[in-house]
Amino acid sequence: MSNIPAELKYVDSHEWLRLEADGSVTVGITAHAQELLGDIVFVELPKVGASLAKDEQAGVVESVKAASDVYCPIAGEVLAVNEELEGEPELANSDPYGDGWFFKIKPANAADLNGLMDAAAYAKEIGA
């Protein structure tokens, strides 16, 4: 079974979100997503300063098995991207909830986080 941290929020496209103390939101792909993808060999991230709509494509993950789009789970402005992933895309496999994060976003509306799945709902979604 996949590791599903209780403190995070989730969406059905297999991204996780963590609300930070400064009000920003860190986004990455779930352990379940990286297990399905297999060994990740390339990650394309959004540009810092980009304004993304909810469910807009924010990047791409390529693995030995497939390429998959990464979506922005809430609307907002990209504040930072994880540049470590450019040289070490395998961090998304080895530490999906830590060093393998994808980008940070300033939410257009913090209330958007309220409609997202908690860990229990995500576990049910993926049959864990």
UniProtKB/Swiss-Prot annotation:
InterPro entries: 2-oxoA_DH_lipoyl-BS (IPR003016), Biotin_lipoyl (IPR000089), GCV_H (IPR002930), GCV_H/Fam206 (IPR033753), GCV_H_sub (IPR017453), Single_hybrid_motif (IPR011053). Binds 1 lipoyl cofactor covalently. Transmembrane segments: none annotated. Pfam families: GCV_H. The modification N6-lipoyllysine is found at K65. Its cofactor is (R)-lipoate. GO terms for biological process: glycine decarboxylation via glycine cleavage system. The keyword DNA-binding does not apply. One of its GO terms (cellular component) is cytosol. Keywords: Lipoyl. Residues 24-106 form the Lipoyl-binding domain. The glycine cleavage system catalyzes the degradation of glycine. The H protein shuttles the methylamine group of glycine from the P protein to the T protein. Belongs to the GcvH family. The glycine cleavage system is composed of four proteins: P, T, L and H. This is Glycine cleavage system H protein. It comes from Chromobacterium violaceum (strain ATCC 12472 / DSM 30191 / JCM 1249 / CCUG 213 / NBRC 12614 / NCIMB 9131 / NCTC 9757 / MK). The gene is gcvH.
